[in-house]
Amino acid sequence: MWKKRKEHLIPLEKSKKIIYLEKRGRRQEKKSVGAICFAVLAVLCLLYCLTIALFMGYGTAFFAVWGALAVVCGLVSFVLSRKRLMQKLPRVLKIMVVICFILGLLCFGVVEGLICSRFAATAQPGADYMIVLGAQWKNNGPSYVLKKRLDKALEYLQENPDTYVIVSGGQGSDEPVSEAQGMYEYLSEAGIEEERILLEDKSTSTYENLYNSSSLLDKGKDRVVLVTNNFHVYRGEKLAEKMGYMHIEGLAADSYPAMLPNNMLREFFGIIKDFWIGKL
């Protein structure tokens, strides 16, 4: 009789089943540190996105990326907080995700370090030409970042009366005049002689700013000072060097502190894109 019963017994390895008991009350299972961190990041990204949209002036819709980051961080937090779901995920997949995350952080850190390395860029006196990169021109005058560039350019031009300046930037759909025309009027009204100001009013990007401006000078011989905001100097210099400017120096203007995280993140993607397509 014992033998018959034994024949109907299910092997131990086939009968194993893990039962998770849901913890309730004060002894409820605590959230993982990773889930909490990503939840906090999601809230911060969402708040920053809304702050830019509601209270700060912005020239592009890039700030929406912070909203997308909030969604991604929220989803990651949700997954990390679900123990059963984490148990079901293949180990190989989890290892690959962790490796990609670490490599992404390293890449981000290196690029941001390069950007920060040119935050305080200064230029030697006596340049032949200066190029002021364009930015949004509003109905009531230059945007904050463009005004900072123009004021920094004005300081250098007043101290170096033999330097010519190229103001570079076309007219966007939301701009009353071309950026170059607006900058021309700003500098001339500040006392810079009109014959020293050259206009390049067709460009729509940093690359085009530099490419179109190169026809107004000699890239191989002339010393050129490139004026832009601190977060933008590194990319501007590298684009110019790749384009054949042999004597290029960045001159860093200040930027709006509250918008710096947004501008730094945008520069990161800009550098990655330009490197990918061979412009850097």
Where is each model-derived feature located?
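A transmembrane-helix-recognition feature enriched in membrane-embedded lipid enzymes
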Residues: L260-L280
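Structural signature of transmembrane alpha-helix termini at the membrane-water interface
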Residues: L47-L54, L75-R82, L106-S117, I272-K279
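A structural signal for short, hydrophobic/glycine-enriched beta-strand patches
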Residues: V110-M264
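Hydrophobic membrane-insertion alpha-helices, especially the h-region
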Residues: M96-V110
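Membrane-water interface of alpha-helical transmembrane segments
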Residues: Q28-A39, T60-A64, Q87-V98
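Cytosolic-side transmembrane helix boundary signature
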Residues: A68-C100
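Short, positively charged and aromatic/hydrophobic N-terminal segments
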Residues: K3, L9-I10, K14-L21
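Membrane-embedded alpha-helical segments of integral membrane proteins
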Residues: V33-S81
